[in-house]
């Protein structure tokens, strides 16, 4: 049982004096789990973290998904060291970016052409620009609760109706921009049809997380993605897959390979950087040729395709391409899911677990979760208590009821067994 967070608390107090909110991303604060000082980590190795107080944790945050090969994986670390020794930024073309682009195309046949950027936010933002350039239209359709980065156009929430023009979800986003976004519920074909009947002639693209990762792990209903493609193309719109979370997480070829559905454009990030900042987007040749210098849709970046990120990404994919990687993640994920459910039954705790291979979400509810409304109507207060109990047990989770637990190639059966025991102790405390 971890009881000493003295240095983390002192560091957070100091951070509040210098960094807005004491964190560099709001998801790192503990606001969503009842408040308190977030734990400051000092180093990571494999599936483990050590904080500034010297406490050790089994990590299921995985930096919100990118660290699928574990912390400081030797193959990835070696590649980063080599890149650092050779110079991390040139501002010129390199052989590394060509090699990495070819690897991505091999993994995802829908990528005729690829362009590297520096984040998932940038990748999504640019696919939208490209879709608008290609179609000559301005509106974007997205699904409620799906997060696509913090650019103005996608930082919107649904209005009062089941399908509606967006309303700003952040101060600083003009209403006029939010009104270019139509939001509909995930997994609801009828509402999608209604929205396209009304606005389809104005829609440049439908933006989709093919497997949702931002209100927990939620899979599409059978046939849903196929109908999204069919309806979008009938309306003259493109389909953009946001695979920032899903690419290389569930299968080497991403969700589009796993589910057998092909988008027009794909946005990538997280895992493909091996832990370094990265994004990429790609798609059909005739669409991607809208991008400068070939076409009128401008996109550029000083850091884009830098040798350090390219090297880390290549090394990460080389690890993931090894035989048995995804089978191991699935096996450990199934073991963890089974153990959590057994502990919940033992201690009479109401939960639902959504799992796909090596990622899962624990919702404090008995309801089936298949859309954002369902995820919202879960017990956040109970999750907050569970989160802090697990932290004291040495289990590092994301501080939000909406986030996933991510397994890495470095987790072991022993890690899972300890985690299940810790879940049991946390549930026992919650049941009192």
Swiss-Prot record:
Cofactor dependency: pyridoxal 5'-phosphate
Molecular function terms from GO: glutamate-1-semialdehyde 2,1-aminomutase activity; pyridoxal phosphate binding; transaminase activity
Assigned protein family: Belongs to the class-III pyridoxal-phosphate-dependent aminotransferase family. HemL subfamily.
Keyword Cytoplasm: yes
The protein's name in its UniProt record: Glutamate-1-semialdehyde 2,1-aminomutase 1
Matches recorded under Gene3D superfamilies: Aspartate Aminotransferase, domain 1 (3.90.1150.10), Type I PLP-dependent aspartate aminotransferase-like (Major domain) (3.40.640.10)
Keyword presence, Isomerase: yes
Transmembrane segments: none
Pathway noted in the entry: Porphyrin-containing compound metabolism; protoporphyrin-IX biosynthesis; 5-aminolevulinate from L-glutamyl-tRNA(Glu): step 2/2
Cellular compartments annotated: Cytoplasm
InterPro entries associated with the record: 4pyrrol_synth_GluAld_NH2Trfase (IPR004639), Aminotrans_3 (IPR005814), Aminotrans_3_PPA_site (IPR049704), PyrdxlP-dep_Trfase (IPR015424), PyrdxlP-dep_Trfase_major (IPR015421), PyrdxlP-dep_Trfase_small (IPR015422)
Enzyme class, spelled out: isomerase
Keywords, ordered alphabetically: Cytoplasm, Isomerase, Porphyrin biosynthesis, Pyridoxal phosphate
Known catalytic reactions: (S)-4-amino-5-oxopentanoate = 5-aminolevulinate
Gene name of this polypeptide: hemL1
Assembly, per entry: Homodimer.
Entry EC number(s): 5.4.3.8
Primary site of residence: cytoplasm
Organism: Bacillus cytotoxicus (strain DSM 22905 / CIP 110041 / 391-98 / NVH 391-98)
GO BP term, pick one: protoporphyrinogen IX biosynthetic process
Entry-annotated residues carrying N6-(pyridoxal phosphate)lysine: 270
Coiled coil regions in record: none
Gene Ontology CC, one term: cytoplasm
PANTHER family documented for this protein: GLUTAMATE-1-SEMIALDEHYDE 2,1-AMINOMUTASE, GLUTAMATE-1-SEMIALDEHYDE 2,1-AMINOMUTASE 2
